[in-house]
Amino acid sequence: MNEFEKTNIFLQIDGVELNISAISRKGKKPPIVFLHGFGSTKEDYADIIRQASLSDYPFLAYDAPGSGETYCSELEKISIPFLVKTALAVLDHANIEQFHLAGHSMGGLTALLLSHQNPDRVLSFTDIEGNIAPEDCFLSRQIIEYPAANANEFFERFVERTLHTPAYSSPLYSASLRHKIRAEAVEGIFSSMVELSDHGELMDKFVSLPCPKMFMYGEQNRALTYLGYIKSKGVRLSEISE
């Protein structure tokens, strides 16, 4: 079995010091780059090494600034545009020119903007419930709907609300949030997700990407209003059952 190796990547983005925690595997084919979602980490994708059909593919996954084992010197500066710059810097550090891209939630939005800015580098894009419309801000819009006195107060109340969300595995997700995301990073991430979802023309950016595209979603989100539209534009849909 071709296992992965764990490494650290030291970067500076907009004057912010980063120590990126990453896992990767070498190989001869174009690599798969994974960008995790909000409240998740690189380990979400480590089981790629257990998939025989992907055994020939190298891959790279890392903890985004504000998440997991990655160190960030100024958490308040993190936003989706900041995460896009980070992704580009990580790719350049790893000498990755062309790649297959998969992103979930926050990582899906980051991946979309990364693909839009670098269409010649992305060979395929699997968007796992990443934001492409205002209706996708069911978590991030809470930064507006539930104002709080400070970052820690918002985060603690967010964790409690998430515990009771009627979505599969919400209690498990809620229980892990304090271990996977820094409270001080949440406002910048959520605010930029809302701004981009409302005004960033994400749908147009997504359907106009020249690479093959897949949109994955859970069965609880099959009522998303745009699924038929993106399918008509050539996006492959993949519904995941419970």
Task: Say what each PLM segment does.
Residues V16, L60-A102, M106:
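Active-site loop/oxyanion-hole signature of alpha/beta-hydrolase fold enzymes
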Residues F34-G37, S105, G218:
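Glycine-rich His-Gly loop
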Residues L112-H116, L123-F154:
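Flexible "cap/lid" loop of the alpha/beta hydrolase fold
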Residues E187-S241:
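Conserved serine/cysteine hydrolase catalytic core
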